[in-house]
Amino acid sequence: MANLLGYVGRRSAPYVVRRFIGANNYRYYSASQNLKSNLSEPVGEDPIEPTEQASKGNINEVQDGLSKAEMNAEESVPWYLRDDSSSPLLENKNVELPFVPDHAPSSVNTFLELLSNEYGLEDIELFDLTQLDPENEYHADNQPTDYMIICTGKSEKHIYKASNELRTYIKHNYNLIPKIEGMASNSKTPAARRRMLRRARKGPLATDNDYGRTPNSWVMCDTAVNNTCIHILTDSRRDELNLETLWCREEDIEKYSTPESATEESDDIFIGIRRFHTMTPFARRFQQMRSYSASQSNESLESYLHKLTGESLTVDSLRQHIKGFESDFQQPTIKDYNTRFNFYRSIHIQNSDVMSLEKLTSILLDKYSSLQIILSNSIDLSKERTQDMVDFMKLLIDSPEIKKHFDLSNSKQMNSYSDELYDKLAQFVSSLFQFSKEQIDMSRHPEFLPLLWRLSFVQKNDTVIGSRMIDDIIYQEGDLPDLPGQPSIFQAKNRARDTLDLINYYNQKIDENASTTNSFKELLLFTYGNAGDWAKFWNTWEISFNLLNNSKIDSKSSIKNWVRLVVYLAIRNDRSAIVHFLNNYWNHSTSIAGSFIDDFELNNNVFNSDEEKRSFKNSVYKMLNSMNNDNESNPSFSNVKEFVDNLD
């Protein structure tokens, strides 16, 4: 019936009928010019008579006569031949478009107008990821998207139609095939129809519930045009996901964040019927006795946690705090369980004899034994499991109980220590996903991969060069520290290799859309340098930052990478690495990775900012000063000094 109405609306139905049935593609039906001219003449009157009256000065009477004639003519015309006029009850809703920065490509503004004016989407938001903090995981340098557009559709059908039209538009106007996810047609294949008929004979399944995650409720379109990505969601799905908090600036988080609230009260007699139908009698009685709210937090529990912060307490004091905490741990929410873990974690760090790692691991898993948490639709258990894995890896790194069983000054003991960390993580993950069919989403949490890699090495001293130190020196005008030039970490090479193999397998087999970010690549680079493994350091530099990225990054990004490399080498203060850089990567390199001078010329012989130029000059001077007299007489090094001296 719907197809038939659509066909009629496109072929011959009048405008009012077409608008009622929702036909989008149609051709206006209008009367011929001759018919309109004939119908506009007064019937039964001499057309010259109004002119004669006008000559006598009766202008008002002429106007009244003309208006009456027009009304009579309009009433005599069939309704489907009258001129089109929109109903006064239908108001055109003007959608306010977001501000488009001046540096954004014109295609961004084109997409915004297309989504609003042509497709009728609402609540359009634009996020410029190039303006985020460089340390932000979603900065344009850390992932392949520069601009995110979020908008809301009226229904799943509306979103499907808009997504289909958007794909067609990009295909015909940009000669590109966009990548669209979440878009599904409502049409059923013959095999699906037969399967549904077999199900119908057996009766409906009580578990056939998508819980709001229906097809076309969230459609993502990677336009492949100027690194622009478009998300179209239903209003309820958009409120649930709250994607805006991922890509907004830090100062705008409060604007988009929505407070977690308890289940809304409703007078609807059908609310919760589907969920109630699938519950066991015990679960129904349990829910009637205690209502669950994910946002409730027992303030007294948090007060116990604050008492442990920054204090070194005796064993008796710790046990008194534990007794008071457990007495207030009544009808716990998901937040209370997390507070409980952080409370006992602080005790474990202070005194592992009072709270062992085994007990603390059980406390972290206790929340999954709570029936009200498992049955709650307001809690994303997949997200909770990912966060628990992150918290457990942090616990393994800081736990004093594991470290006291190994002599970390011995290389063999360090390897055994790293093996122990990975073994405990594997046991925890096995328990965490024991009764779940989910797979681990390694790309969901920005800290997951860095922490997984962090388990592969042990710090030898307190000063380890990382991305944050490099940022402080470049952008905060920090001073270059004087380090001894010795390795600051020990890396378990076998475990590091296994970790990289696991990440590559996940990106190739599990989630083909996942890719390592530039921040994680820089973490790998600095780890090899801090461990003194310079062969892998330079190999990672060529593959991750130059060789494979020559066709993907512009000259500005190349200069940024060179500046960060020079600052790192100056801080690391390893003479062999400095000599290798000056001989092989400074000018006219024979390596496929290129050289700094080549990329500097491609960038019109300028740095991206004064901060980069200042930090680059100071770092090169520090490297040259660390060389002995023989190396200073090297003509290639004198050319380096001359280049730096001539920088404005």
Swiss-Prot record:
Give membrane topology per the record: Peripheral membrane protein
Transit peptide feature, positions: 1-29
| InterPro entries to which the protein is assigned, alphabetical | Atp25 (IPR040152), NT_sf (IPR043519)
Q: Name one GO cellular component term.
A: mitochondrial inner membrane
Q: Does the keyword 4Fe-4S apply?
A: no
Q: Does the keyword Mitochondrion apply?
A: yes
Function, as annotated, reads: Probable mitochondrial mRNA stabilization factor.
Q: What is this protein called?
A: ATPase synthesis protein 25, mitochondrial
Q: Which source organism does the UniProt entry give? A: Debaryomyces hansenii (strain ATCC 36239 / CBS 767 / BCRC 21394 / JCM 1990 / NBRC 0083 / IGC 2968) (Yeast)
